[in-house]
Amino acid sequence: MTIYIVTFQTYETGEFQVSYNVFSKRKDAELEARELRSNGHTKVTVVKREVRF
């Protein structure tokens, strides 16, 4: 199964963080990334991972 997560640096402290949301579609992850960028966060990246259960 493929999942997508969004990583970013906060605009206030510059700390590296991972979004709490996990997405099954890249399109949804890109929407989250766009929102984070519009809120001033930097180095916003969509990361693709393969997981097995």
Model-derived segments and their meaning:
Residues T2-Y4, T42:
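Short beta-strand/loop motifs in extracellular/secreted proteins, especially
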Residues F23-R26:
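Conserved aromatic
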Residues T13-G14:
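Acidic, low-complexity, intrinsically disordered interaction modules
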Residues V18, L31-F53:
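Short, mixed-charge low-complexity intrinsically disordered segments
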Residues Y4-T10:
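A short beta-strand micro-motif
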